């Protein structure tokens, strides 16, 4: 199956067009006013495939999280609810929502419960960002969401009558009486580790690897490097003060917003940080690139607190794939970007994933097959090509087998995984499997007829942004 250079070029262009899904996965949010400050959000799966996502820190979360942004005269109204850090694996089913293509669900909430709207008058409401998708109860990637812009005329008298979601507590001490015994020891160690790791990350932001910095903050400009370094330096300083700084720290939950999926949360409006029970199950410091631990959880939470470094950050992209998909300006305002960068500096993670962290199919999805570019998505049709490699599914056995350093495929006549050296041997679907299609990259595409040629390209299919 030989083709000319011109045909190869034409097919490569066609491949580039076909590689994108017909309807990229996304959630569309329609906001409407129920009455005064009470809002209804209709969440719709606008993509072409069923998706499962984490609805914590999103619509359907019963906690007072930031679901929308509010603006008065183009200035954002201060949010007075909580910002949570979630576990990345072992998520409970109750934290997940599954939507078929075109399916919707609704969530109603009162924006006056998490913002001071007693002034009344015109307020603009909108939201956008990324929501984590999940597979096997683990965060495996992300999809974007965005809403319409809703204009309200707030009745101040009615807004005053809405109770605040967070009741003020006595905060006379910086590290509260909940931090005693073993929990005090855990917190003190975590603060020391956070101070050390954040300090190293601040130095790396100022004068370290530009490639590593750009991986997380999408820029190497001096202004952005200085801004990141300044925030991380402030986080390191806050952690080193061990209770003498701007935050108030709780070793247990005084407000009742922890659950089995939340590591910790911050109340930015009062600079309070709360550890949940799950925090104490984390390692002090992880050995895994982009893993979660106690130290980087504190870094994440301290970036939310404006008393540490104003303004506090948001949760715009959660996890490595979402955080590294943000623009430079959004990454500057994203808590997980700082925690992930600090982890990467500490463990020297540059190049270990290259942004190609995929499913391995043998354990939890989202793991990287170390030392190779062998990846599986475990979720779609066999024959998909993962970018940067020519390693593919065979569709007949278990995913996760590695064919390193070759274009090794199943030949169908003997044991799977045999190597056809010196060729790009694939299934052609028309005769016996294992035939050789020399001088081309002939492969299954999983969506049409087998045996199509995708010359001089890595054919990529898949309707999710992979983790």
UniProtKB/Swiss-Prot annotation:
Q: Name one Pfam family in it.
A: Peptidase_M35
Enzyme Commission number(s): 3.4.24.39
Cellular component terms, GO, for this chain's entry? extracellular region
As its record notes, the protein acts as a catalyst of: Preferential cleavage of bonds with hydrophobic residues in P1'. Also 3-Asn-|-Gln-4 and 8-Gly-|-Ser-9 bonds in insulin B chain
Q: Where is this region: Disordered?
A: 359-467
Localisation per UniProt entry? Secreted
| Polar residues: bias regions | 359-451
Where does the chain bind Zn(2+)?
Answer: 300, 304, 315
Give the range the annotation lists for the signal sequence: 1-19
**Enzyme class label:** hydrolase
Q: Can you cite a GO biological process for this protein?
A: proteolysis
What does the record's cofactor remark say about binding?
Answer: Binds 1 zinc ion per subunit.
Give one GO molecular function term: metal ion binding
Q: Where is the active site?
A: 301
- The superkingdom of the source organism is Eukaryota
Q: Which Gene3D superfamilies does this chain map to?
A: 2.60.40.2970, Collagenase (Catalytic Domain) (3.40.390.10)
Cystine bridges: which residues?
179-251, 258-276
Query: Any chance you could tell me the propeptide residue ranges?
Result: 20-172
Which cofactors does this protein require?
Zn(2+)
Similarity remark = Belongs to the peptidase M35 family.
Q: What is this protein called?
A: Neutral protease 2 homolog NFIA_031120
């Amino acid at each position: 199956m030989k083709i000319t250079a011109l045909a190869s070029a034409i097919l490569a262009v066609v491949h580039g067009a076909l590689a994108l899904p017909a309807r990229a996965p996304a959630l569309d949010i329609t906001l409407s006013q129920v009455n005064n400050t009470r809002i209804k959000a209709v969440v719709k799966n606008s993509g072409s495939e069923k998706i499962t996502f984490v609805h914590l820190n999103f619509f359907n979360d019963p906690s007072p999280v930031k679901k929308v942004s509010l603006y008065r005269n183009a200035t954002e109204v201060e949010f007075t609810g909580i910002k949570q850090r979630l576990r990345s694996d072992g998520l409970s089913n109750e934290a997940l929502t599954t939507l078929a293509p075109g399916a919707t669900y609704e969530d109603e909430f009162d924006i006056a419960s998490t913002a001071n709207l007693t002034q009344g008058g015109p307020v603009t409401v909108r939201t956008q960002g990324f929501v984590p998708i999940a597979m096997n109860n683990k965060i495996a990637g992300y999809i974007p969401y965005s809403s319409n812009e809703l204009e309200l005329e707030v009745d101040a008298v009615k807004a005053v009558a809405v109770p605040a979601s967070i009741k003020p507590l006595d905060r006379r001490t910086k590290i509260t009486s909940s931090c005693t015994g073993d929990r005090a020891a855990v917190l003190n160690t975590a603060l020391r580790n956070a101070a050390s790791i954040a300090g190293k990350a601040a130095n790396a932001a100022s004068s370290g690897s530009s490639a590593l910095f750009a991986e997380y903050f999408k820029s190497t400009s001096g202004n952005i490097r200085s801004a990141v370094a300044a925030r991380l330096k402030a986080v390191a300083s806050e952690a080193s003060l061990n209770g003498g700084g701007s935050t108030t720290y709780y070793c247990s939950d005084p407000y009742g917003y922890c659950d089995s999926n939340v590591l910790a949360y911050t109340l930015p409006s009062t600079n309070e940080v709360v550890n949940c029970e799950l925090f104490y199950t984390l390692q002090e410091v992880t050995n895994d690139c982009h893993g979660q631990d106690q130290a980087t959880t504190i870094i994440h939470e301290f970036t939310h607190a404006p008393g540490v470094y104003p303004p506090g950050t948001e949760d715009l992209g959660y996890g490595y794939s979402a955080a590294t998909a943000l623009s430079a300006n959004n990454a500057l305002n994203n808590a997980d970007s700082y925690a992930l960068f600090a982890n990467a500096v500490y463990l020297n993670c540059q190049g270990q994933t290259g942004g190609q962290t995929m499913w391995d199919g043998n354990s939890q999805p989202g793991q990287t097959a170390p030392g190779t570019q062998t990846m599986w998505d475990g979720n779609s049709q066999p024959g998909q090509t993962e970018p940067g490699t020519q390693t593919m599914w065979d569709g007949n056995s278990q995913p996760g087998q590695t064919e390193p350093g070759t274009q090794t495929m199943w030949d169908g006549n003997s044991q799977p995984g045999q190597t056809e050296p010196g060729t790009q041997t694939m299934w052609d679907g028309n005769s016996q499997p294992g035939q050789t299609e020399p001088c081309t990259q002939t492969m299954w595409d999983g969506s049409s007829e087998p045996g199509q040629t995708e010359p001089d390209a890595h054919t990529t299919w898949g309707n999710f942004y992979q983790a």
